[in-house]
Amino acid sequence: MASAEIIAVGTELLLGQIVNSNAAFISQELAADGIYVYHHTVVGDNPTRLKEVIEIAEKRSDILIFTGGLGPTEDDITKQILADHLQKQLVEDEYHMNKINEYFASRNRTMTENNKLQAVIIKDSVVLNNDYGFAAGMYLKENNHTYVLLPGPPSEMKPMFTKYANPLLLSENGNQNILESKIMRFFGIGESQLAADLNDLIVNQVNPTIATYAGDNEVVVRITATAKTKEEASSLVKDTEEEILRRDGTFLYGYGEVSLPELVTAMLLEKELTISAAESFTAGLFQAEIARFPGISKIFKGGMVTYSEETKQSILQVSPQVIKEKGVVSAECAKEMAENVSRLCKTDIGISFTGVAGPDSLEGHPAGTIWIGLSVKGHETEAFQFVYGRDRNHNRRRAVKQGFQLIKQFLDAN
């Protein structure tokens, strides 16, 4: 089985100015191909150190995948150093050169000479077209190694890898069996707890394999099976999926790449249920999230951010008595906020968020104490309490996702 190493080139990565998300993406894709990634390497824009990294990687990996260093500036050195190492010439790729010329001509701008560097490739390499930029990618086999050169910006790298590089890698190095994969998404359970629940499956895994990943306030489980036929592979995945659901199915919210907010929004659109939101400590995060999706104007009528007691009373019409006797961090306040925003915006559903974002306490409640109110036409209004940690922004984001989960649970049950 072929082994791969991902080499990210860029001093900005070493300085922590940019997160190396490219390596995570490529590793996940290669895992699905049956190509094992054993090393991630990050090296700055230094010719000597990059050459050292290449020499080390060749001793331990069959496939070397580079990201970054293909641009027009002096510190973009990846292809120059690799070409020198392989004793290969650099030549101009006509397609990318024409693309660069046409770009500047169409804007009536003079092209600087260094822009031509983006169209330069290592001789004898397969050119990987850049559909979203100018820097050409490369795929090259030499001395029993495969070299893949990809641009650094994820918006250029991901489509180039998916459309051009990965099919070549898969055809030449991938698992010859049929590979089937399924992604399960969980909310409301931590990665450590989920991993503990599935520990015997993970420890004894052979085929399928199970991997857990911590996402943004969620946990992702990836099941991957290989077999001679698609039917066999699918059956292996299904058996494992059913066992996982038996243990932790109550926390599952969906499959694949669809996020919880996206899934809930689609459900609301399908059911043609309108929604509004009243937010205190989340300060509009829920509304900003739901507004990201196309067609949302059909169901999202609006909302209110009422951060202070005064605006809760004057704008959202929360009872002064409730605030005085129960406080803003209470089930009663959350219920009134949800009911009133639904009434004022004339929607089927009203959701509210009130609580203590942190790090300080409020009204005697510790940081991370939150209430979410849910008012649905024809149903009794409910309020749900959750207690998180002291991280202010983490609490706000988690509460928003929790709100979407509560809506999903209602829609699933009704």
Curated annotation (Swiss-Prot):
Q: Which Gene3D superfamilies match?
A: 3.30.70.2860, CinA-like, MoaB/Mog-like domain
Sorted alphabetically, which NCBIfam families does this protein's record hold?
cinA_nterm (TIGR00200), molyb_syn (TIGR00177), PncC_domain (TIGR00199), PRK00549.1 (NF001813)
Which InterPro entries does the UniProt entry name for this protein? Answer: CinA (IPR050101), CinA-like_C (IPR036653), CinA_C (IPR008136), CinA_KH (IPR041424), Competence-induced_CinA (IPR008135), MoaB/Mog-like_dom_sf (IPR036425), MoaB/Mog_dom (IPR001453)
The protein in question is named Putative competence-damage inducible protein
- What would be the name of the gene that encodes this protein? cinA
Which family is this protein grouped under? Answer: Belongs to the CinA family.
